[in-house]
Amino acid sequence: MSMEASELQDLSDDADYAASQQQGSASMMRSDSGKRSSPSEHEDAELIYLKDNVAIHPTQFASERISGRLKLTKQDSVLFLSWIPYKGQTSNAKLSEKDRSLYTITAVPFTEVRSIRRHTPTLGWQYVIVVLSSGLAFPPLYFYNGGVREFLAIVKQHVFLARSSEDPNVFIVNDFQSPLQRTLSSLELPSSLPVASGQSVYPLDGGSSNENQGRTSADIGNRVSSVIQSGLRKHKNHDPTRDLSIHLLEKFSLVTKFARDTTTQLFSENNGFGSVDKRWNNQPVHSYPEKLSNIAEEKHNEIRHSYSENDLLKDEEISNDIDVPADPLEFNNISLVWGKPRQPPMGHKEFTALLDSEGRVVESKALRERVFYGGIEHQLRREVWPFLLGYYAYDSTYAEREYLRSVKRMEYATLKQQWQSISPEQAKRFTKYRERKGLIDKDVVRTDRAFEYYEGDDNLHVNSMRDILLTYSFYNFDLGYCQGMSDYLSPILFVMEDESESFWCFVALMERLGPNFNRDQNGMHTQLFALSKLVELLDTPLHNYFKQNDCLNYFFCFRWILIQFKREFEYEKTMQLWEVMWTHYLSEHFHLYVCVAVLKRCRSKIMGEQMDFDTLLKFINELSGHIDLDSTVRDAEALCICAGENGAASIPPGTPPSLPLDDGTLYPQEDDVL
Amino acid sequence: MSYAYLFKYIIIGDTGVGKSCLLLQFTDKRFQPVHDLTIGVEFGARMITIDNKPIKLQIWDTAGQESFRSITRSYYRGAAGALLVYDITRRETFNHLASWLEDARQHANANMTIMLIGNKCDLAHRRAVSTEEGEQFAKEHGLIFMEASAKTAQNVEEAFIKTAATIYKKIQDGVFDVSNESYGIKVGYGGIPGPSGGRDGSTSQGGGCCG
């Protein structure tokens, strides 16, 4: 049906395609949604609408849904939306309480809603997607008993709803002015959003708040206020544990392990981590878990690993009059935990030792661990990357891999033939093909041409890149081609030096990262959202800063995530980083911890210079080429360990590069949605 | 370097129309046919002089592919000027102008000055859009119009500077409240003193890009 819309450039323009992707990747939530004071819990909030059996699908399986109650409430003439999961009725044991509270939507005012997209298919469940002014969106809300139309009708009675001229299923909220003068609040510009000044805010998981947490917050709140009154920045001086924490040097070697073992537990025990600052946005002060302070004290005497190689990331230019909130994971400027020193890259001998006599990887975890901590010698990459990417099975033998390669070579030739056999006459009647080919032709000559392997006119490798991308756009016609793909393919082709092998490695990579290139950018939004949750967890003051400065959409990290730092490092370093991330050794989402690591490295500069969105975006862009890889990876490792289960829980299931849970199909079938 | 005003520009238009090349020609006075495609946004800056006043242009060069529109839209905020670019040798890039304009109208300040540029006018033999059509479109939508070539540098300087002159005139005419940075204008040293006349954060943090 989309084919008749000739203006559209790509089949992925299909709303249905977008929707199916959206469902698959479990989508987004607004990070601060749970932290407002909740008018629905107040006496004076008027209940406008209540709908039971409205569910969220955290995975692509409807059976794993979380059911709950959707409510509209009104207070002080502002309409609020909330969705609260039912207690103890999870349909699947895999979904914990934590998952449920992660998805809870606590009283979002419609002033922060930009649009509502409705899906009312004839088959399957109706759902709506609520998109916020920040550009983030909540996961689809499935109306199991129907009633989307009624819901929208009721919303319309209370806020101004206008049907989008571009898409009849999209309703723009508060679009009350002429098209030329739409208010910022109804669009993607959060600057005009009302700020609930003076309101108490609560941690996201406040929806599942328990007594213990309440008490902790109260205690800390008292302590915080006294610290603020005395005007002390380093509140840690008040920490009674500080005086207790002189420890022996020989313990240093244990710090990392110790931290690994304890931080997760500490973080979950002490819910105050992070919750304090939210009450005091301008003067964040932290409470440190006791043991962490001890670690910090120990590290005080330790040699700090030097990563301040470049001036961009140094803090020294910060003017003294701006009080930058301290990093909760630092103590006297020494990070609390840090990653292992990088090892030299794995060589051929070492790799062979990991294989049995027939070529099977005896223990994939050992291989992944080795690569995670040291990377791979370049000549060996061609053998190891196909494992990391999932093209080769770890338990395959030499012979099986040889056979796979020959079978896949034929398969590739067949796929390639599909577009090679298109005659000029046929191409004339095949707009989609012509457009894609035109785009790919244009882009491959704009990919790494300064790099020796791809430089010069009529470069054969550039031609291979074009053929692979065009073939891929037929192999995965729904996804097609999108800018950024050539950035991924370029190092793969350089490493594999074989068109068919490169193609299949690229296919394997896109199984995980295809959602980055969805037309609706859902895969990207999901990751940016997860990143915001991780920063909230690992650096609450920085999170608060971003929140206050309308930077919560994390668009400034867009390029980092879209092409996994390809433009931030030189070629060789990019390959090193990729193989580290592709091990999925500590986390499938290690790249997000890398983002946090870089952001934390710059936190003083960002906050000290009071960067706004524009300045921040420019600043982050200009970090390109100035980030030290090894120390960043070590930081990211430390952060990943530090975040532990809480970190993992901050990342919604299905966030790329997680593989789709359903191994059978790359993309969810339309029937799941329609 | 100090400036009287800083204007934020954004360059928009379909992929491959020459946005990055126009920027490079303007900032570095060179044409580089081989460059990486733009992911997200790239920045450039240059000082110009209008009415004897030093004005810094901070230019945002955006990715053109359709998929990135939702991200690109967040860059419009606070832009004082936009260069809307099409390729005179590719008709479809002209056909898409209306949708770009719609984006700009929706997401940018209503007073944003828009310059329509038909790029690659050195390739007249492959022309697919006539100059008159460009003029007509600009007239209908209240845009300034020029055909230019990033390759030969024809009209590139003029396009950026004419846009700046138009913005400058709007300031003189009192269209903007220059103390409000949402108009994409920052007052620097030597500018019209306003309530925030001293605010000049960008001169020190602009990095090396304003050469």
Curated annotation (Swiss-Prot), chain B:
**Record-linked Gene3D superfamilies:** P-loop containing nucleotide triphosphate hydrolases
Query: Per the Swiss-Prot or TrEMBL record, what residue ranges does the short sequence motif Effector region cover?
Result: 35-43
Q: Where in the cell is it found?
A: Cell membrane
| TM helices/strands, residue ranges | none
What Pfam families is this protein classified in? Answer: Ras
Give the organism, scientific name.
Arabidopsis thaliana (Mouse-ear cress)
| Annotated coiled-coil segments of the chain | none
Q: One MF term from GO for this chain?
A: GTPase activity
Q: What is this protein called?
A: Ras-related protein RABB1c
Tell me the function of this protein: Intracellular vesicle trafficking and protein transport.
SMART domains (UniProt xref): RAB, RAN, RAS, RHO
Domain of life according to the entry: Eukaryota
Q: Which residues are covalently lipidated (S-geranylgeranyl cysteine)?
A: C209, C210
- Identify its membrane topology class: Lipid-anchor
Name one process (GO BP) from the record: endoplasmic reticulum to Golgi vesicle-mediated transport
**What keywords tag this UniProt record?**
Acetylation, Cell membrane, GTP-binding, Lipoprotein, Membrane, Nucleotide-binding, Prenylation, Protein transport, Transport
Any Gene Ontology CC annotation:
plasma membrane
By sequence similarity, the record places it as follows: Belongs to the small GTPase superfamily. Rab family.
